[in-house]
């Protein structure tokens, strides 16, 4: 299966029991900032934004004072899982980032998708990639 198929079939799919509800954007990005696959709507990010995200995984709390920036959009960092998941909120939407051994799985959402639904979709694929040694 191609990386693009993982994004299309496992991240940008309808959310379980909520037909028509799906993430706004999603991507799988290597720890080095290289894009493995992304939805057409995933924002163009700057290298320093990815560096900040990777630093927060290694030093939890790094982004809390300044916020998480992706594609020029600022998200307020909310409780995640230290070293494993970063969550951000902006208005009625937000972002979840799950770290695997080699990649970061991104999910961006807006209402009517809930933070919990975004977390579930991103975590499910991230956990699968971890099980596969990725």
From Swiss-Prot:
PTM sites of type Phosphothreonine: 114
Gene Ontology molecular function, alphabetical: actin monomer binding
Gene3D superfamilies membership: Dynein light chain 2a, cytoplasmic
Keywords: Actin-binding, Allergen, Cytoplasm, Cytoskeleton, Disulfide bond, Phosphoprotein
GO CC, one annotated term: cell cortex
Chief localization: cytoplasm
S-S pairs: 13-118
Record bears the keyword Ribosomal protein: no
Pfam annotation, one family: Profilin
Motif Involved in PIP2 interaction: chain residues: 84-100
PTM annotation, UniProt: Phosphorylated by MAP kinases.
Subunit organization: Occurs in many kinds of cells as a complex with monomeric actin in a 1:1 ratio.
More info: The variability of the residues taking part of IgE-binding epitopes might be responsible of the difference in cross-reactivity among olive pollen cultivars, and between distantly related pollen species, leading to a variable range of allergy reactions among atopic patients.
Role according to the record: Binds to actin and affects the structure of the cytoskeleton. At high concentrations, profilin prevents the polymerization of actin, whereas it enhances it at low concentrations.
Name of this protein: Profilin-2
Organism for this UniProt entry: Olea europaea
Lineage: Eukaryota, Viridiplantae, Streptophyta, Embryophyta, Tracheophyta
């Amino acid at each position: 299966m191609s990386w693009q198929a993982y994004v299309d079939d496992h991240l940008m799919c309808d959310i379980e029991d909520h037909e028509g509800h799906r993430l706004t954007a999603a991507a799988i990005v290597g720890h080095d900032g290289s894009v493995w696959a992304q939805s057409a709507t995933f924002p163009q990010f700057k290298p320093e934004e990815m560096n900040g995200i990777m630093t927060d995984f290694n030093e939890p709390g790094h982004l809390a004072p300044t916020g998480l920036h992706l594609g020029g959009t600022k998200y307020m960092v909310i409780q995640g899982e230290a070293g494993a998941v970063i969550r951000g909120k902006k208005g009625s939407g937000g972002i979840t980032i799950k770290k695997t051994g080699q990649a970061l799985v991104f999910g961006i959402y807006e209402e009517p998708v809930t933070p919990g639904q975004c977390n579930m979709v991103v975590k499910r694929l991230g956990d699968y990639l971890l099980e596969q040694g990725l």
